[in-house]
């Protein structure tokens, strides 16, 4: 019975665990990003999408969304990636259409 209770407690805890946004292993939080970030989506041939993120760091063109260990994270689609950022507290503030595609300026929701 204790094992079942422990298992249920661990499962319930995992439901409330939220993913966090990392760029090259650096966690994005208000102290290091401010209110805005810029996303540059990069598409693969299979339709998956990665994002380069500019949050004010010194070399933004080489910084991708990663897990906490620095491994690059690919999303199933552009919308999947934008939904991920929305769930993490960001919303689209502006969309810029450039020669090589769209750029998304995101603003912190809270």
Cite the ranges covered by each PLM segment.
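N-terminal signal peptide c-region/cleavage motif recognized by signal peptidases
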Residues: 12-16
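Terminus-proximal functional modules
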Residues: 4, 17-110
């Amino acid at each position: 019975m204790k094992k079942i209770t422990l298992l249920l407690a661990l499962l319930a805890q995992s439901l409330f665990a939220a993913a966090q946004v990392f760029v090259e292993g650096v966690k994005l939080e208000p102290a290091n990003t401010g209110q805005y970030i810029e996303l540059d989506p990069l598409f693969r041939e299979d339709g998956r999408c990665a994002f380069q993120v500019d949050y004010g760091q010194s070399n933004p063109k080489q910084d991708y969304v990663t897990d906490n260990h620095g491994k690059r994270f690919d999303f199933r689609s552009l919308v999947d990636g934008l939904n991920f950022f929305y769930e993490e507290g960001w919303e689209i503030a502006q969309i810029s259409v450039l020669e090589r595609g769209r750029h998304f300026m995101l603003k912190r929701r809270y």
